[in-house]
């Protein structure tokens, strides 16, 4: 993901949007949710939603249990609560592509279910690259799977390939 944003410079790379080569992508084209939090502790939840141009009513419609924290500073939220706001702030604004790195980390199962519904809604309008260790959830919302190993990715044509390549057990 760092290569896509021009923060890491490999000897060779090929970045394309709909077949058109690009040296790097702009923030208006691609949004990225890093593994670690990015919102400063002193900002309030409602300010973050406003700064990202998001409709607070829509957010709290998806996550009604967080409405009571609307005016809370980010530093007082749990890791999972922070992740919910950051996930929504990156996924939902208009753009062409979204990169989500370990987006389900620290998030309670109820909110992961909501994330999956939001991913289904948003993937109609943009490309989404989702990396996460929660195989079942990733598989449920993915149109295609391309596991990474040793710096390369391979498209999965059949679920049995994931077992053969050692990504999942037969029981999964």
What are these regions (language model features)?
Residues 32-56:
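Q-loop/switch helix immediately C-terminal to the Walker
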Residues 102-103:
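Walker B catalytic motif
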Residues 152-172:
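Conserved beta-strand-loop-alpha-helix hinge in the C-terminal portion
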Residues 10-26:
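Conserved ABC transporter NBD signature motif
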Residues 86-87:
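Hydrophobic anchor residue at the start of the ABC signature
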Residues 73-77, 81:
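Conserved ABC ATPase signature
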Residues 5:
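Helix-to-loop junction immediately C-terminal to a conserved catalytic motif
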């Amino acid at each position: 993901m760092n290569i896509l944003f021009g923060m890491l410079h490999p000897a060779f790379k090929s970045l394309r949007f709909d077949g058109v080569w690009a040296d790097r992508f702009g923030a208006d084209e691609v949004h990225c949710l890093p593994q670690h939090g990015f919102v400063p502790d002193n900002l309030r939840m409602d300010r973050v939603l406003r700064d990202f141009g998001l409709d607070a009513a829509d957010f709290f419609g998806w996550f009604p249990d967080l409405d009571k924290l609307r005016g809370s500073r980010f530093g007082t939220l749990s890791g999972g609560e922070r992740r919910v706001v950051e996930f929504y702030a990156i996924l939902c604004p208009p753009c062409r592509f979204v990169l989500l790195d370990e987006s389900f980390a620290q998030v309670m199962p109820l909110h992961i279910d909501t994330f999956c519904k939001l991913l289904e809604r948003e993937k109609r309008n943009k490309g989404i690259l989702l990396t996460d260790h929660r195989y079942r959830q990733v598989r449920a919302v993915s149109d295609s799977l391309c596991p990474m190993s040793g710096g390369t990715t391979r498209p999965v044509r059949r679920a049995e390939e994931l077992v053969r390549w050692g990504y999942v057990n037969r029981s999964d």
